[in-house]
Amino acid sequence: MDTMGRHVISELWGCDFDKLNDIDFIEKTFVDAALKSGAEIREVAFHKFAPQGVSGVVIISESHLTIHTFPEHGYASIDVYTCGHLDPTIAADYIAEMLGAQTRETIELPRGMRPIEVKKAQAL
């Protein structure tokens, strides 16, 4: 079935505290992940929280990559959404590897497959 895009959502557990808390490392990892997948980078924005944690986004011509880290839990949530021919798993796999994730739970959603008709339930 044709889709407009693919959206990979990953829960990363058992990640290294220092990596999850290092804004420069996270930003470089995400830029590298986008480039490895063949994406064209448009904008990059990351923020470091106190006392810990990083959130950020890499906007690509084909959509986006995002992260929210919780170093105190060894946890990061990532989204990689691509349109067109790009494979989002390339970037998601690279990010999980770079963060040293011990456990990874991932789902992939096809996006833009056409509107879904939802019918109202009939009362009995």
From Swiss-Prot:
Name this protein carries in UniProt? S-adenosylmethionine decarboxylase proenzyme
Report the pathway entry: Amine and polyamine biosynthesis; S-adenosylmethioninamine biosynthesis; S-adenosylmethioninamine from S-adenosyl-L-methionine: step 1/1
**Per its UniProt record, what Pfam families does this chain match?**
AdoMet_dc
One example of the protein's molecular function in GO is: adenosylmethionine decarboxylase activity
Supply the alphabetized keyword list: Autocatalytic cleavage, Decarboxylase, Lyase, Polyamine biosynthesis, Pyruvate, S-adenosyl-L-methionine, Schiff base, Spermidine biosynthesis, Zymogen
User: What does the Swiss-Prot or TrEMBL cofactor note state?
Assistant: Binds 1 pyruvoyl group covalently per subunit.
Which E.C. number(s) belong to this protein? 4.1.1.50
**Recorded name of the encoding gene:** speH
**Where are the residues marked Cleavage (non-hydrolytic) as a site?**
E62, S63
